[in-house]
Amino acid sequence: MDNRPIGFLDSGVGGLTVVSELMRQLPHEKIIYIGDSARAPYGPRPAEQIREYTWELVRFLLTKHVKMIVFACNTATAVAWEEVKEALDIPVLGVILPGASAAIKATSGGKVGVIGTSMTISSGIYQEKIQLLAPTVQVTSLACPRFVPIVESNEISSSVAKKIVYETLAPLVGKIDTLVLGCTHYPLLRTIIQNVLGPQVKLIDSGAECVRDISVLLNYFEINGSRDDEHRRHHFYTTAGSDSFQAIASAWLNQTIDVEHVTL
């Protein structure tokens, strides 16, 4: 047994969708989460800047003696995951390959849509991974740069959010049977997205799919947390104001959590 925590990094609050799924599937694991909300969104930023910020988050998590790092951010995964994975001697997971694999299994007509930040979409990484595994699948990608600010400002139920989602996703309506939510912020807009595309379109949460891989690696490396750990405690950190982060996190995780502000 290994009672060290699992480290999660994201550009802000979006990675909490991955944490929520981990708490459901692996409730005995401890969590350290760092959200860089002060510099969110990452999507419009240059790749080199995203790489620099990601390494700062990684180094922060390493000071917390984590046993594994999860890139709970598609943009950071697209830009820096391979590099970080090769550099560290602990397991490092990203969210893109699990999401791509799940989309291939889910599609009924071979028409998959991918939505994400500008950087994730321009990298072409989802299309590359999907067509590497399933060359006949048709992939339609769409950048949704206005989605992350909606989530970070906790306006996911507002009329403005509905208007933006409807306008942005209009090009995909009637053209896909499966949609990858290629940003961990997007599941927080899941209800609106489903309403726009219709109930026939299957939505793939790349972060939730990633948790299945976390479980596999914990078993493979024999680093599962103890179910009898009486000192299990989660820690959440943000580079922005802790009040806003705490409100979003407590609502999404359905429990009151403590959030600490950090400067990287």
Swiss-Prot record:
PANTHER family: GLUTAMATE RACEMASE. This is Glutamate racemase. GO terms for biological process: cell wall organization; peptidoglycan biosynthetic process; regulation of cell shape. Its EC number is 5.1.1.3. It is an enzyme of class 5 (isomerase). GO terms for molecular function: glutamate racemase activity. Keywords: Cell shape, Cell wall biogenesis/degradation, Isomerase, Peptidoglycan synthesis. Provides the (R)-glutamate required for cell wall biosynthesis. It comes from Streptococcus equi subsp. equi (strain 4047).
